[in-house]
């Protein structure tokens, strides 16, 4: 039987992002904590130096999001907002999925490109993660 990979999610994603920069991102989750996503998850994919002061960090993240060629979006179950979640403060597309069933995926789709251009072009790749982690402190 194949070994199931074990790793700290943020560290594994940082390894995958090495030498690349984010072009666009789509996150699918059942449970969602907007403040945790903005403060702890999103910085992993932007790879910029950030202040430890929350208000300054938010400004830095907003500037980084504005510089992306495309948007970042989070799709979550309409009933999946964590009750103790902090409010969203960044310009991230947040889309509550409403239907009769439960929206329960936990996937990440990242369009990335090489940081360094080769002959004026940057190769792009789609990074896909299928996992069991919600975008919450306890899930991540």
Language-model features: locations:
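PLD/PLD-like phosphodiesterase catalytic module centered on the HKD motif
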Residues: 1-140
